[in-house]
Regions:
Chain A
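Short helix-coil junctions and helix-kink-helix linkers
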Residues: 172-181
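Active-site segment of metal-dependent pyrophosphate-handling enzymes
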Residues: 5-9, 26-27, 55-60, 64-112, ...
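Long, intrinsically disordered, low-complexity Ser/Thr/Pro-rich regulatory/activation regions
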Residues: 199-236
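N-terminal strand-loop-strand
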Residues: 1-42
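Short, charged/polar surface micro-motifs in flexible loops or helix N-caps
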Residues: 18-19, 36-38, 50, 98-104, ...
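Conserved hydrophobic/aromatic positions in well-ordered beta-strands
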Residues: 12-14, 95-96, 122, 214
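Short histidine-centered catalytic/ligand-binding loop motif
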Residues: 44-52, 159
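NUDIX/MutT-family hydrolases
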Residues: 94-97, 106-147, 151, 160-168, ...
Length: 236, 236
């Protein structure tokens, strides 16, 4: 049987970056398309699924080729397949990951040094996105919705933070994800009651009064992929 | 560009059915394959995605053709795309839904009466599945894992119940999903504290002492599809 339907992958990589005004905002990398359809418009990193690789491997490959980024875990976001989402019939399997800003900086720098980094990649704050190709605006909106839902019942914000962090760091990540301010005292009570955080003996010192550093309780696995093996869920 | 990758859909339909011994067990419909690959083995209802329909519409169509079932909402479970999951290269987008046993009975009966019901469909209890084609055993295992996870933070068990039910009915559904017995008093405390249930003025009477009927608090939508439209998420 011949099908005139092709399979593509796209990847939503979110990081928390500090603006010049000192705020933390969510940002993601986009690629300026050089050919039709949607030439000269921005799109998520991605490409065609090839015969010899799984969708998650294709996501990792195309992400690495364009941005140099190599997240330790890519989660499947959704398979988008509406009939009219592209001028030709394309089903896109979309993956997503959260990356710490320092990992983004290190991996991007190594990619530039390799001489293989394309010129047409740029990071955008999610509240200042350009016009997007295909249904990629909707895909990003869905990824942000999923992130906001997930932050309520999991340790997803950990993906933005170093191994040790202050409660103010964690609250700042939650505020950027949820797009609203949180009361510091309420936030402290809630995260302490959750049992997810363990206090360390260390403090961050600086211009403010010393703030205790916390780490996540790693008795619970961060990325529980359930019964699926690595061929369906992550990068080998 | 030509891709030798084809796109299929499959559907996992779960219901809670009562065995002859009076227990409630999870069950799902399977289709006996009549051709290669995996001829004479059981598989999930499904088929090829056609050019003019979205994956969720293809799931609804193939499910209806084989089983006569028409769930009001199909949720995307996962896109399975491992290279070796089929003798040829196939990406399967899998949807799932929960159906009440009385809806299953009514829709199956109407399908049989139509004269279009195929002979090769049968329901199986999930603890007594036959040998399955492709990676369908893993897909079912993943659907059950997702259901068990979801029951903890959502009203997913509602999909198995009529609009009014006793706490014993609800506990029985949870026990079938989780595969373990739950303490009746603890269970009552937890669901009452959740705020998800509203007591009615009605009682079920019969051979036992009268049991109060409850309904779900429908202030919260049961199936929150987020920012995705119906072309990606459900049946029109």
């Amino acid at each position: 049987m011949t099908q005139s339907i092709r399979v593509a992958v796209s990847t939503v990589i979110l990081t928390l970056r500090r603006t010049e005004s000192g705020d933390a905002v969510l940002a993601l990398p986009l690629v300026l398309r050089t050919r039709e359809p949607f030439a000269d418009q921005w799109a998520l990193p991605g490409g065609w699924l090839t015969t010899a690789e799984s969708p998650v491997d294709a996501s990792a490959r195309t992400l690495s080729e364009t941005t140099g980024l190599a997240p330790s875990y890519l989660e499947q976001l959704y398979a988008f397949g509406a009939v009219d989402r592209s001028p030709t019939r394309v089903v896109s399997i979309v993956y997503w990951a959260l990356l710490r800003q320092d990992d983004v900086d290190a991996q991007s720098e190594a990619h530039r040094a390799s001489g293989r980094a394309p010129e047409n990649v740029r990071w955008f704050d999610i509240d200042d996105l350009p016009s997007l190709a295909f249904d990629h605006a909707k895909i990003i909106e869905y990824a942000l919705w999923r992130l906001r839902n997930k932050v309520g019942y999991s340790r997803v914000a950990h993906g933005f933070l170093p191994s040790e962090f202050t409660l103010a760091d964690l609250r700042e990540a939650y505020e950027a994800i949820l797009g609203k301010s949180l009361d510091p005292a309420n936030f402290r009570r809630q995260v302490e009651a959750s049992g997810n955080l363990l206090p360390t003996d260390r403090f961050r010192t600086g211009s403010h009064r010393p703030a205790r550093l916390y780490r996540y309780n790693t008795d619970v696995a961060l990325a529980d992929r359930g019964p699926l093996g690595p061929e369906e869920t992550s990068i080998r």
